[in-house]
Amino acid sequence: MQFSKMHGLGNDFVVVDAVTQNVYFPEEVIKKLADRHRGIGFDQMLIVEPPYDPELDFHYRIFNADGSEVAQCGNGARCFARFVTLKGLTDKKDIAVSTTNGKMILTVQDDGMIRVNMGEPVWEPAKIPFIANKFEKNYILRTDIQTVLCGAVSMGNPHCTLVVDDVETANVTELGPLLENHERFPERVNVGFMQVINPNHIKLRVYERGAGETQACGSGACAAAAIGIMQGLLENKVQVDLPGGSLWIEWQGEGHPLYMTGDATHVYDGVIKL
């Protein structure tokens, strides 16, 4: 199997072309490949498939290191666009892809950065999914070690984001897994810890569902910015500083799609026997 190793701000991926090669990945194979000591090592595996819809260019599948399939990965989307361009699978600047729960437009800009139309944030609790009687700007979540206030949203995958005074000292290691597996999130959740620097600038750490804390989480950056804008803490354009680097998020509010802009890096190509 031929593959490429890529990263978006340190959030690392193995990307596989399933357009020109036949591949099949049972959960156990994904876990073995994800092992950083005995396999290749990655946060997520991205599969480029032929489009299911003739009006689209590709189908985009994402698997976590634990073998679970997820519907969205923002950093992965940028790497997906870089990969299909580098490999000559398309020469389009605007690339239309489907995911397991929607469609996305990936734009390769003239400056090399990649802008992703992430669609509209979804606030309705049942669609996140999140157990709540009605939408609220903040929800109270109780854990064994701490009770927190957080916003909840879906960016194609479930996110909760809480505001902290200092991301460096935030209790991500303990609180992250407790919130990820909280009973009110039936499909688990990605957990963001957000420090507001000013209305156009935040710092963020993300404990990802099925992957733990990563260097960067694109959909997590989108979720944090959307929640901050919705809560009146942030303006429409936000720089998000993650441990691995920065992303730029733009959202004009309800009824508008949210855009994420950032880099995507090709590290190396390889071949591995399955």
From Swiss-Prot:
Protein name: Diaminopimelate epimerase
List of catalytic residues: 73 (proton donor), 217 (proton acceptor)
GO biological process: lysine biosynthetic process via diaminopimelate
EC main group: isomerase
PANTHER family assigned to the protein according to its UniProt record, in alphabetical order: DIAMINOPIMELATE EPIMERASE, DIAMINOPIMELATE EPIMERASE, CHLOROPLASTIC
Coiled coil residues, start to end: none
Pathway(s) the chain acts in: Amino-acid biosynthesis; L-lysine biosynthesis via DAP pathway; DL-2,6-diaminopimelate from LL-2,6-diaminopimelate: step 1/1
